[in-house]
Amino acid sequence: MRKVLLPTIIFIAAILLVMRLFYLQIIDDSLKLKSDNNAIKIRYDYPERGYVYDRNGKLLVANQPSYDIMVIPKDVKDLDTTEFCSLLKITKQEFIKKIAKAKIYSPRLPSVFLSQLNKKEYAAFQEVQRMFLGFYIQKRALRDYQVTYGANVFGFITQVNDKIIENNPYYKSGDLIGKQGIEESYEEFLRGIKGVKYIQKDKYNRDIASYKGGEFDTIAVQGKDINLTIDAELQKYGEELMINKRGGIVAIEPRTGEILALVTAPSYDPAILVGRQRSKNYTMLYHDSIAKPLYDRGLLAEYTPGSPFKILTGLVALQEGVIDENTSFVCHHGFSYARGRFMKCHDSGVSILHNGIYNSCNTYFANIYMKTINKYQQPSTGVDVWSNHLKSFGLGQFMGYDLPTGKKGSLPTSKTYKKMYPGWGWDSKTIVSNAIGQGEVLMTPIQLANMIAIVANRGYYYTPHIIKKIKGGVIDKRFRTKHVTTVNKKHFEPMISGLFDVYNLGTAHGLNVEGIEICGKTGTAENFAKINGKRVKLQDHSIFVAFAPKDNPKIAIAVFVENGYWGARWAGPITSLMIEKYIKKKITRIDLEKRMLEGSLQAEYNKYLSKPIIDTLIKTKIELSSKPLSVKPEIKVTQPQIKAKDTSGN
């Protein structure tokens, strides 16, 4: 049996081997290409990245030529190192280090030796390139910013690292890739497809012809142009209004979910992350953790929402049927909700939903929140019902927008409080601060903007997004999917009536814009930090949300100014100016505009530069840079995230 089996196995193996050799040699030419690799030079043709335009067709980001010196280590011969280093203004130590790095990548494949030469450096090297065997010029395209704003929206491009090369076979050493912003989100559209040329070499390593007449060559495909939803003029104006302030602005077109402005402050000129100084500038921005210019507050900062959250408290109470628009409560400058527990309020008298919202009465909203929770036999059930309503507004979750960064905020559930109070019971009184947007609730500015957009739409929203058009491409269908909240449409009208009178009778009565019906809500959130073991009061935050016009709204906006005192001090005026700018295309309230543009919170931020607070920042794992870089005139200070109680009522 063994005598028969062994020859049979050998025969079958031989047949398989012959078939494989036939396939590789006759059918599959790729092996021949690989075997000839020692006599073939590979050259890449890099396409231009797609241009970036705003919603109105204004060019924001174009391209400029860049030149890299590439090296193939095995081809470097008879090099005059002194002359070479002198020409490129590098030291011999730098030369040795760069060559060693190239050899590690591959002795036979090209990699970047020196990147992003300017035109003068390129011309000088090109004249004598023939003297330096193994080196050649690779042309690429770098970004050429047409504007000085929008850095957080655009992101930047940088060289790929080893991990990217390992995980994605498209990229080779020296290739560029988008990081942050739309450059990262839409990398595959913007980058295009690089072309490849295979060049036959002779025994003297000289180029002689295209390999096999160019049979394996591919043509570069240019990147796709894109239009953003951003209104360039509104974005620019928002950044100007936030100079010398810290915070975020997010403006959305309610009926589509298109992001009209996404402002973070402080910011920087995107042009500083282009060219030979890009790495140095990025490092300085990255380590500037006082100003944190790379931190997009509109998407990443999780704040206590303060009084604007009362909008949701009211809508959920209406939906749960625990109140109607005429349900009333008496306020005595506050609310005694438990023994020894008193929630302050600036209001007094009888409040129903309408004046409760425009006067921002803490007493009113604390009562209706407790009624919502107490509707159910167990507070845990009540909290989960309340929480599920809020999830339908996009709270407590990543919203699915098309930017590569973000936070989901914090939305407490019964599990939250079972964990917080494991040894004793809790009820609606224990967690009543949720009623006014404090307690355990945290929201990002984009969530606040989406919340007020939902109110403007009377109960629905489209996922906020930054892309409007891709040339030759299709917008993701998730941005065309309508999301409906759990709150019935009929409950939004009485709430909107109260928000409209915030501008007519309430906390924003001095911020009206002639000819525009605005609905909005002020917010003031107290701010505390623990310093040397003590709870210390810091300056309050200023918050404002609004939409306009009241009917057929065109813009919904959220503004958050850190340490901005109260809602109507900074966030309110900035909101009304942004609305006027977008709808009217001009500003009529010149004095107010001047005050906001020239106003600065630098003196306030300087108070928090004392050593105890700096030590607090260090303990919260924030590394401080001794040399912060800021291109625009922003103050550089940050504070640890602290949950706050809102006692002002506005």
Tell what function each PLM region has.
Residues V474-F479, K594-Q602:
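Intrinsically disordered, low-complexity charged/polar segments
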Residues V61, D202-D207, Y211-E215, R255-S307, ...:
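Beta-lactam-recognizing serine transpeptidase/beta-lactamase-like catalytic domain environment
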Residues A525-N527, L601-E604:
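Short acidic/His-enriched helical or mixed secondary-structure segments at domain edges of catalytic enzymes
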Residues M1-Q277, E302, G382-S392, A435, ...:
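Periplasmic/cell-envelope proteins involved in peptidoglycan metabolism and beta-lactam response
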